[in-house]
């Protein structure tokens, strides 16, 4: 096992638009190598060229000193290069073993009858070697995302993968699942397996990786060994400038209570939740995965109305039974799943921006092309959206630009309360700072922001107060001076 890969001067254009220009990447046997860059820098495209999904326009790929190009991903996989995408390729209604043997099923001769017992036993043994003890006959839908990720790695190893490419591998994992993943990576690197680690999570990269290659605007910027670089240097290389402090300075002018929930309860999700948000405030919401944070936000927005309890806006009790009720109260909700809930991927930027703003963009009862065009231009400029025009389909945008479109479409209703659920997940460092600046602008105008985040540095860096949820109840509320990673985790896990 073991493989040395060298990619040099790789170029690629789509419809005449250059995506990669003289990109380079090299990985050694048993190395965990981060591939970093802002969204749209060309990281995934470069790896798709390596694995035969896209054909390069120029440059060379050498594997163990021999020039090599794959016709498709299957050919690359057979050669020993596996790509585990952010959206895992696990079929929930199949068993663990069926997922692992998909396309490679063991059969009794040519009868078409599966060797189910043998496949279950092999699957269990493979997973046990990676520290995951589950039955091969168990349905994949019963497993957590972290466990499904280990199954993807086991699938890759069953095809004798020497190089495993992982795209944003920890985006949906709990802290404990991340630890498990890192244990598996460390075990396999000692056996000569190499990992390409595509991520924006700097702390993880400095914890698990040996080296970093940085791309910017499709070009190779440089390679650094982890012990010889710093967070600031990597960020500067990624964005082509120093972005200064990670979190922009906040000048909080906190005013009257704008929103209050009293004893909010949703059966089976959360109970007796009470808290307030004030004008000009960013309220961070922390808690372990499954604690009920998103469920509370969905209740505020009317997706899943409260079974009991009260909601007050500016001191007046209101009933929110649907998103329309929430929008009338100028409440906006940006969900954590932007692709399935926040955007219509086949629509253009302009069409997505118009969706919650049809009333404001109409003259009489007719949608005004002029108003729609102006609104699109204004929002793209305000949020620094990188796109060819407002007619570009949102599915072709980078993750950071997609997130900006989700935020922009809700800014059109001039929200007095903006709820952001995991606002910077899968977003690069430069785009993160722009999103933080938007949050600050809103609060400086006297509006309020609720930010749900699993990244504690983000919660601490941006929040005026932190609401901690534990098993569907309020674990505690911490002021800026009291909040620390330790105090938040103590409340999130049921401590004092």
Curated annotation (Swiss-Prot):
Q: Taxonomically, which superkingdom?
A: Bacteria
Which reaction does this enzyme catalyse, per its entry? D-ribose(out) + ATP + H2O = D-ribose(in) + ADP + phosphate + H(+)
Tell me yes or no: is ATP-binding among this UniProt entry's keywords.
yes
Instruction: Please give, as recorded in its UniProt entry, the membrane topology of this protein.
Output: Peripheral membrane protein
Q: What is its EC number?
A: 7.5.2.7
Q: Which residues form the ABC transporter domain?
A: 5-242, 252-496
Which GO CC annotations does the UniProt entry carry?
plasma membrane
Q: Which Pfam families match?
A: ABC_tran
- Top EC group: translocase
Summarize the protein's role.
Part of the ABC transporter complex RbsABC involved in ribose import. Responsible for energy coupling to the transport system.
Record text on subunit structure and interactions? The complex is composed of an ATP-binding protein (RbsA), two transmembrane proteins (RbsC) and a solute-binding protein (RbsB).
| Protein name (record) | Ribose import ATP-binding protein RbsA
From which organism does this entry originate? Bacillus cereus (strain ATCC 14579 / DSM 31 / CCUG 7414 / JCM 2152 / NBRC 15305 / NCIMB 9373 / NCTC 2599 / NRRL B-3711)
